[in-house]
Amino acid sequence: MKKEKAVVVFSGGQDSTTCLFWAIEQFAEVEAVTFNYNQRHKLEIDCAAEIAKELGIKHTVLDMSLLNQLAPNALTRTDMEITHEEGELPSTFVDGRNLLFLSFAAVLAKQVGARHIVTGVCETDFSGYPDCRDVFVKSLNVTLNLSMDYPFVIHTPLMWIDKAETWKLSDELGAFEFVREKTLTCYNGIIGDGCGECPACQLRKAGLDTYLQEREGANN
């Protein structure tokens, strides 16, 4: 894959930034694509742009604001509380988001001569999101190949690892401090370690604490 080109679906968060570093190591050329779907914090787009600029990665932002018209949710509406009731989808779930993001990433990839698409979806910590499942990604991969008659390969480096292992991967890629300090995972728009209270921050911190304990134990 070292001679090929990839497009990374990129939000500027921990997972997609780790995937960006992974792609840089795996492919000869990498581009990043970020989607503006009127998310609560436009800082997410700015953060993604800054990271791409710092890493020297060509960065495209696509307007997907129609998602907010079709599927109101807590990631785009400040008047909706971030909740996750047992047996129900989280209020942060956006119907069709990964379906559309990966589809548009594929269109872009074909236009720029890339057949590899990288996304940070993860089934281990999928938080009740059906479009983060491996079966969905594999199904969409086949559909995209058929729809555009093009040999896309969707890569999911984080699919079967948890947050602690994601931190480990970033460390192995030499990007641990970069990911910790410069990414935006927090639903409240705080870069780095975040607010520590929202579900995204709690998941990130739990993984970080576990990995740091494991790393310390391995070094002793």
Curated annotation (Swiss-Prot):
Cofactor mode of binding and number, as noted: Binds 1 zinc ion per subunit.
Keywords: ATP-binding, Ligase, Metal-binding, Nucleotide-binding, Queuosine biosynthesis, Zinc
Documented EC number(s): 6.3.4.20
Catalytic activity: 7-carboxy-7-deazaguanine + NH4(+) + ATP = 7-cyano-7-deazaguanine + ADP + phosphate + H2O + H(+)
Binding site for ATP: 10-20
Cofactor(s) this protein cannot do without: Zn(2+)
UniProt xrefs under CDD domains: QueC-like
Top-level EC class: ligase
UniProt pathway: Purine metabolism; 7-cyano-7-deazaguanine biosynthesis
Cited InterPro entries: QueC (IPR018317), Rossmann-like_a/b/a_fold (IPR014729)
Pfam families documented for this protein: QueC
Binding site for Zn(2+): 186, 195, 198, 201
Role this protein plays: Catalyzes the ATP-dependent conversion of 7-carboxy-7-deazaguanine (CDG) to 7-cyano-7-deazaguanine (preQ(0)).
UniProt subunit comment: Homodimer.
Stated name of the protein: 7-cyano-7-deazaguanine synthase
Lineage of the organism: Bacteria, Bacillati, Bacillota, Bacilli, Bacillales
